[in-house]
A protein has these predicted regions:
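A generic hydrophobic-helix recognition signal that picks specific residues
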Residues: 5, 191, 235, 328, ...
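Predominantly soluble domains enriched in secretory-pathway, periplasmic, or organellar proteins
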Residues: 16-473, 481
Length: 898
């Protein structure tokens, strides 16, 4: 076979990138994420290979026609879901087909020119798509395409509902609802059968295409979460990977009977994509939670070997998709966590002796690759390699995306009992939201030779390392056994930098975008004046589900990353994130690592990985015991912790389980209880103070203290609740009281307090919509410094890990940029910190006359992130600046909702 020389078509100038990487200057590295240059929030500088084609919102599916002419991609994000067909010769999208909802499953039968796409329920945010075929969800959408043009037309819908007797989906709170959720797909070589894993129904569907789409169900293990599918060359046997049970089920397609389960990894190892070689001798399975590829011997139905495709720095390359080269000599592995393709030697006459099963090298891609395909050379065209990356190069500027201010705009229908009549996030809505503007990309290239892959490997390795890395300065307190013995990690909700600190008058700030400035947040302003002002810290998240994984685990598992967007989009995905084992990261959470290393800790309010009282089909006795140990060192408040007094992060402004007839019963304050508060009220800080003083008396203050403080999320202008500025001011007072309490204690000299936001989805920012206000408070924190270096949430986590001597949980925190620049080697900032009293009345309540009070009263503002952020942005702006004021534009790099 002739392989042409690889065409290098990166979308960024590699020379400039290498110059930045090799420069010794601390200022050579950029400090602002910029899609125009491929510089990401986490500090990675993308240098992707291949001609790049812009795709839709978060594409996770890809399949190519047998002739290699047309690449089908499936957009499966929070925004508009669609099919985009790429002409791989002209390297452009030739057709976009709107669909109600997608999970990313797509399979092509090139013999009959039929395409099959997994369909899920239409989003209520997109009412114009409710009339599209398959709007009820749980179906397969069938299309035909023309050989010459590649253009497709819709043919029919194949329903695949959950089979009778299916168990309810696992959700928090619990539900009786069932769902199927067709996931990846496989079509038999002759096109007669389709194999459909049903991710939420513990089963697979076998569709007999030639028998009027007759559907038979194959029952799999309870709590299996079936995901990937493959069919052997003879067309009689299918394989289904099961994410939670760590197995591959072997299915007889003629009878619809499961023959056996092959264990390919431990429970919760998340087997995902499966591919079978042309001879039907071996199958390959990607284990996304373990950074491994498993080889199955299909003659003996057993695991032949397991191959690591991870990085030595830590877990988290996340292999999610596979493709075998046309000649069968190599396996291409899409690694969504490392933005690369790993390439492995397979047994083949073309493979040199001794190289079988070894790593050839790695190919850098754009961000978050979720699909990879290969095509044989034909018609004078070289063999091809193609990939689909869900996040592309990040999100670009949005200078014309102001927050909608018209109360009669369709956005205001979003949480009305009457469904919206126009698309909330559609063209012309004027609404922007983080995640809905994420755009994927396809990378197209000639199939590289081994030598070319090896030459690309150094670029892939450079790409995963953040720019501007620093060596630990001499005497830094960010070290195990150093002077800092107690870490306090405060996680707040959703504010961006300019919304709070735009009026600080220092650093890179814009007062025109400020809502909760000096008068509302005097404590934070004072803290970032005395301690470092960090004006380039970015949230890695778009919303709270991701945000609390980043803060508590330094990573977001692929299961969470691909599913939270559809839960937020109201397409029927249950909320199981962080509370059911199937959603947990491979190495667990910070609390789990503290347990493993015997590092003392206490958790105030974080529910991620801390719900042992819930029934869970996938929780082993060992995992249950681990959760119980964490729960014993946690306070999640009434209803979740026996005798608990510190409310969990799940609700805003109310105690879980308060009296529905009295919406103010059990109202929660972040700060000390204000005088005149309603009966039964209490505060997070009062709860913390009682436990902290007890720990001090016993000389038992933990090394790691994690505190959720959520009152700054606000309740909008809902009648009877504190006005937004009062809730944010109360949260600010809580922060001031926390620092005051710690700084006047006997452990202050050995303490550090890190304050972050879980995400940045609220407000406008002139630098980047992901920028957040962060405070670092310690006797060792630099006095009055202004620090422009780029950091992210994982930088904060890594800094805390270094202090505690905690091992990194993932590739993300292992490679993150520690906040060395924020600290000094000596305690030069050791004076106690006094809390500044609130400058506004914390008991001021919204009245029916408040701006858009009627609208706020219809919204579920007591639930985290249950309201489109653009909507809440406008409410908050008008609550401060008046009903006739106009909120500012979203600013550069905003995503939908900002």
């Amino acid at each position: 076979m002739t392989i042409r020389r690889l065409s290098f078509i990166p979308i960024f100038a590699l020379v400039a990138v290498l110059a930045a990487l090799t420069s010794g200057s601390a200022h050579a590295a950029p400090n602002t994420p910029d899609p125009a240059t491929g510089f990401l929030l986490n500090g990675r500088q993308l240098t992707p290979q291949g001609a790049q084609v812009r795709l839709g919102n978060f594409p996770t599916g890809g399949a190519v026609t047998a002739d290699g002419r047309f690449l089908w991609t499936v957009s499966a994000g929070l925004g508009a879901n669609d099919i985009r067909i790429v002409d791989t010769v002209r390297r452009r999208v030739i057709q976009t087909i709107p669909i109600p909802g997608a999970s990313g499953g797509v399979a092509l039968d090139s013999r009959h020119r039929l395409a099959y796409v997994s369909g899920i329920t239409v989003s209520r945010w997109w009412p114009t798509q409710a009339t599209l075929p398959g709007a009820a969800g749980n179906c397969i959408l069938v299309y035909g395409w023309k050989a010459a043009s590649g253009k497709a037309r819709f043919l029919r819908v194949i329903p695949v509902p959950p089979q009778p007797g299916s168990l309810p989906v696992q959700a928090f709170p619990a539900t009786t609802a069932t769902n199927a959720w067709p996931q990846k797909l496989a079509v038999s070589p002759d096109g007669s059968r389709l194999l459909v894993p049903l991710n939420l129904a513990d089963s697979a569907a076998v569709v007999d295409i030639n028998e009027h789409d007759r559907v038979r169900y194959v029952r799999l293990a309870s709590g299996a979460y079936p995901f990937g599918a493959a069919i052997l060359p003879g067309g009689r046997t299918g394989l289904v990977s099961n994410e939670a049970t760590g197995t591959v089920s072997v299915v007889a397609l003629r009878t619809g009977v499961k023959r056996r389960d092959i264990t390919v990894g431990p429970p919760l190892s998340h087997p995902q994509d499966i591919v079978v070689d042309r001879a039907g001798r071996r199958a390959y399975v990607a284990l996304s939670a373990l950074d491994e590829v498993v080889v199955i011997d299909l003659h003996h139905w057993r695991v032949e070997r397991t191959i690591s495709v991870g990085r030595s720095a830590g877990l988290g390359t996340m292999p999610v998709a596979l493709a075998i080269s046309p000649e069968g000599a190599r396996l291409f592995v899409a690694e969504s966590g490392a933005d690369e393709l790993a390439v492995l030697h397979l047994p083949s006459p073309m493979t040199r002796a001794g190289l079988t099963w070894t790593l050839v090298g790695r190919i850098p891609t754009t961000e978050d690759p979720h699909a990879v395909v290969t095509v044989a050379a034909q018609g004078g065209r070289a063999a091809q390699l193609m990939y689909v990356a869900a996040r592309g190069v990040g999100v670009g500027p949005n200078p014309t995306g102001p927050v909608t201010t018209d109360p009669f705009d369709p956005i205001w229908w979003a949480f009305n009992p009457i469904a919206p009549t126009t698309d909330v996030f559609g063209p012309g809505s004027g609404v922007t939201y983080l995640a809905a503007m994420v755009r994927g990309q396809a990378g197209l290239m000639a199939l590289p030779s081994d030598a070319q892959v090896k030459r690309l490997s150094p670029a892939a390795t450079r790409q995963i390392h953040p720019l501007g890395a620093q060596k630990a300065p001499a005497g830094t307190p960010l070290r195990a056994g150093g002077p800092i013995k107690h870490v306090f990690f405060v996680v707040r909700e959703n504010r961006d930098y300019d919304q709070v600190l735009g009026d600080i008058g220092r650093g890179n700030s814009d007062p025109h975008l400020t809502i909760f400035g000096q008068d509302v947040t005097p404590n934070l302003h004072a803290l970032v004046t005395r301690f470092p002002l960090l004006d380039h810290v970015f949230a890695n998240s778009e919303a709270s589900i991701q945000g609390h994984f980043w803060t508590s685990a330094a990573s977001v598992p692929d299961y969470v990353d691909r599913n939270w967007v559809q839960e937020y989009a109201a397409r029927g995905r249950p909320n199981d994130f962080g509370v059911y084992a199937v959603t947990f990261p491979g190495n667990g959470f910070l609390f789990d690592q503290a347990e493993r290393q015997h590092i003392s800790y206490f958790n105030y309010g974080e529910i991620a990985g801390d719900q042992p009282t819930l029934g869970d089909r996938d929780r082993s006795p060992a995992l249950l015991a681990e959760e119980q140990r964490v729960a014993a060192n946690s306070d999640l408040g009434p209803g979740l912790t026996p005798g608990g007094t510190y409310p969990a992060v799940g609700g805003i402004g109310q105690v879980t389980g308060s009296d529905p007839a009295n919406p103010l019963d059990g109202e929660i304050f972040d700060s000390s209880l204000p005088a005149g508060a309603p009966p039964g009220s209490y505060s997070r800080i009062d709860s913390f103070r009682a436990r902290f003083e007890s720990q001090l008396a016993a000389n038992a203050v933990p090394a790691f203290n994690y505190l959720c403080m959520t009152g700054d999320h606000t309740r909008g202008t809902q009648t009877g609740f504190p006005i937004p500025t009062a809730m944010v001011a109360d949260n600010d007072l809580a922060l001031g009281q926390l620092v005051d309490l710690i700084s006047r204690s006997k452990i202050w000299s050995s303490s550090a307090i890190f304050v972050v936001e879980d995400d940045s989805q609220d407000g406008a920012d002139h630098v980047n919509a992901h920028r957040i206000p962060v405070a670092v408070i310690s006797p060792y924190a630099r006095k009055g410094a202004i620090i422009h270096r780029r950091y992210d949430l994982v930088s904060v986590v890594r800094s805390m890990e270094l202090i505690m001597g905690m091992k990194a949980l993932s590739l993300n925190d292992a490679l993150a940029t520690p906040m060395y620049e924020a600290f000094t080697s000596r305690p030069l900032n050791a004076a106690p910190v006094g809390a500044i009293p609130a400058k506004i009345d914390l008991l001021t309540r919204n009245t029916a006359a408040a701006p858009w009070a009627a609208l706020s009263n219809r919204l579920p503002l007591g639930e985290v992130d249950a309201v489109p952020q653009g909507q809440l942005d406008a409410i908050l702006w008008k609550s401060v600046h008046g009903a006739n004021s106009t909120p500012p534009p979203a600013g550069p790099n905003a995503e939908k909702g900002q």
